[in-house]
Amino acid sequence: VSPGTVSRALAGKSLVNAKTRDRIQQLARSHGFQLNRLASNLRRQRTGVIGVAIPLGHDRGQQISDSFFMTLLGYLADALTEHGYDLMLRRVLPDQDEDWLHRYIGSGMVDGLLVIGQSDQFERIETVAGSYLPMVVWGNHQEGQRHCVVGTDNRLGGKFAAERLVEAGARNLAFLGDIEPIEFAARFAGACEVAGQAGVPICVLSAHLSRERALAEVTHHVNTLDPAIDGIFAATDTLAVTCLNALSARRTAVPGQVRIIGFDD
């Protein structure tokens, strides 16, 4: 048989009749032959790999072991496997590699790219989006942007969260988190809109997402919390739980004295 027939048979193609295909595969097994996927993909000019990048420009201490990332990565891996792709994960620190996105897509290692969160890399993603089409970003949509985004309506979610606090009786709100990242800024903006309409003040209790820093910062905020604050909107569920634990340690009644709500995608 020809090399092409052998190649198609080893790949399990139906173009080769079943008897011949089975015979070739049996011979390959008896000689310990394994199909070189890398060489096969090189010939077809595809890698069979989808890259997943998590840029941490706004908080380089944040860990991928965060429950949100782990859940999302699990679903991505399941879906990619079902479609015959492998997943290549990269944690990106933009301050150490400003050209990380161009370098990644130009490496030839992936057939497409998923970016989890825009962080402070919106403009860099926009620059690449004009020439690199197989890229999808999990994040916040802004009017007129070029890159394809999948995500929740963060501003609307922020409005819902603040409305819930106000309806529960809160009259002095605080946003717990960093308002610099695009998604968090939108959540805060939604909360501010509701606070303005309700005539209640809202302040920011800044907190990072990395576990150790968040614990220290949230504990400090709770220990020095203005007694008037009776409603806290946490930028993430993890921050909300951290805040709840800190309040409980001070024997502050939740939701009796302080109401808390978290946000996650």
Spans of features found by a protein language model:
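N-terminal helix-turn-helix DNA-binding module of bacterial transcription factors
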Residues: V1-G48
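Alpha-helical recognition/docking segments in bacterial nutrient-uptake
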Residues: Q45, V49-A53, G57-E163, H221-A228, ...
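Hydrophobic alpha-helical
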Residues: S119-F122, A185-D265
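An alpha-beta-alpha
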Residues: K159-L205
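Short acidic/polar active-site loop segments enriched in Thr and Asp
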Residues: S2, G48, D111, A170-L173, ...
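Short hydrophobic segments within beta-strands
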Residues: A53, I116, W138, F175-L176, ...
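Short beta->alpha junction loops
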Residues: D86-Q96, I179, C203-R213
